[in-house]
Amino acid sequence: MAPHDDFKTAPVALWLRGRFTNLPRASRMVLLLACAAVILVCMYGTREITEVPQELMEQHLVKEQGGLYRVLKGSAPSVNLVVAATTKEDYSWTKDLKVPGMVVVPYIADDLNATHHAQQNKGHEAMMYHQYFYDFYDDLPDISILIHSQQLSWHVEQLLDQSMIFSLNHLDLREVQRRQFLNLRVTWGIGCSTNTINTTRVNEESGGTPEQKEMQEAFRANFNLYDVPEILATPCCSQIAVTREAIRRVPRKQYEHHINWLLTTGLEDSISGRTWEHMWQYLFLGKAIDCPLEHRAYCRLYHICFGGREEYDEWIELNQGRQKLEEELRKVKGEDGDGKEPEKVEEQKKLTETEEKTKQKSREWLESELKSVSEAIRVRREVAVVRGAVEANRVAEGESLYGDEAEPGVEVKIFPQTVLSARGRSTAVP
């Protein structure tokens, strides 16, 4: 601005100042705030505003507070955690669970004086599950989760740290409500791709599934059906989640019938309990086969999303590679002459002297490779957990849990020639 312009603007400034001072105090405050707003718009109006995704904010909040991994929309569903146990089994680890509103309901198999107990110590967890359904039929929560008493077990997958605490803290309760019944285990290895039940093989012994030859009669007795499904397939191992609606679709009297069958069957206790590992999906869904695609089930149920089938298969292959490296390393470390015949000890010593450097190099190489593979497994798993925190990624993993044209389900991959559907379902009790 040129110096002579001051003479032109000064009278205007004086006039504005006079007008401003003559305004009421409230009007002056409003005018000042309006001016401040205009200045801020001018300063920041051209800047791009980027919002942090809500789910990432939730994930950070939950991580900081050590709580449930998934922040639920709306009020959290009520949950009973039914723990099938004996008096000698410790289930105190349940106090470390972070599921809001969860009530632990222990069912004790061998103590008739316990608050909740089985009528008789028979049928393993199946007896206690049915007793719970019968006892709580009119007082059920939104969701019932029924598990064994062990916190760490092979029944829980390696991807879930083989930990029931990890599994339940990461369980998406909304997904349970959507599906109404599900198995907490998702891998096909036992129950879907191997150790499935063919009910027509009533005379065949099976080392992996000793209950197979009893399944036809067990199914027929429990469901009052003559035409039994040929194939029964679902992930093992009788740890399930089920909604109030699904439980009540089955008449209460039918649970009493299942209890009576477990009490009176001539089958060995271990066999009668195992038959129910293959029948829960039929009881609650009316399906003989319930094997969701693994990577989609992990993504939807536990929010561990690898990004697709190929990426998930790569993670599986890395784990298989790690197992092979561990086996080779054990062999190398065990080649020190233990168990050798006396006349061969001296020869072994000579071989050891000449080959020690080679063995040492092999050991170091195997240890280095094992470390690298283990780190790759860890990183991919952590990335999958982060990816699963975003709902859009869970949707992108695949809509259909049971397969589509791009990725067929278990019926196409494992049982393409088998008639899978049951010929009618009856809930009548004999």
Question: Which residues does each PLM region occupy?
Answer:
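ER/Golgi luminal nucleotide-sugar-dependent glycosyltransferases, focusing on the catalytic module
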Residues: 2-430
